[in-house]
Each structure stands twice: as C-alpha cells, then as structure tokens.
Amino acid sequence: MIHAIGTDLVELERIKSIGIDRFKDKILNEDEKNEYAKINHENRKLTYLAGRFAVKESLFKCFKAGDKTANYKDFSVLNDSVGAPYVVSKHTSDFVVHITISHTNLYAIAFVVLETKV
C-alpha cells in the first residue's frame, strides 16, 4: 500500500550559486561523498548533487505525512551495479522505497514513493 509520495525539482544554477563544495558538505553523508569523489566531470558532479538533494527533499515531503524527523545526512542515496539509485536509511526500514531521478542541463527532478511493507 502506498504510504506517501514526494517530488522535488532543483535548478542546477541554484546549486552553483551556493557553491558546489559547500552544498556537497551540507547534504552528502560519507557513503555519498565516497561515490561523489569518483566522479571526474564537473557537470556530472553538479547533477549528482542536484539529484541527491531532490531525492532527499522528496523524502522529507513523504515523512512529513508520517511525522518523522530526519536530516539530509540520514539518507544515503547510492547507485547499484547498473546505476539505478536506491536509498539506505534507518528512517526507511518500514517501507519499500521507490525512487527515480532525472536531469537536464538546467534541472534535476526526483520522485519518491514510500510503500508500506506487507
């Protein structure tokens, strides 16, 4: 059963204006920083950050419905062996989490569905 849904749209220019390194330190946890460190292309680093931010904001919208509290670093948004994103967090242990991330040259968007485990 669907517990909650969330979506978020991020302007890449907004992240650039804040500063990529500052933004990275604000939202990424250590596991994500390890993935991020392997990225060589600057534009890919930007879309990685924007995508992670969009997923985490989407998750916050989902948990608002369930009165859960969390911060950015409580969620690891990682990639599996074929590049599909997935979430690791103590806050999601009661749910199956479905996420998708997409981006263009200007924006990144994420959509999250929290499904109650049966």
Curated annotation (Swiss-Prot):
**EC nos:** 2.7.8.7
Disulphide bridges, residue numbers: none
**Keywords of the record:** Cytoplasm, Fatty acid biosynthesis, Fatty acid metabolism, Lipid biosynthesis, Lipid metabolism, Magnesium, Metal-binding, Transferase
Which top class of enzyme applies to this chain? transferase
Which superkingdom is the protein from? Bacteria
Major subcellular location class: cytoplasm
Q: What is this protein called?
A: Holo-[acyl-carrier-protein] synthase
Its gene name is: acpS
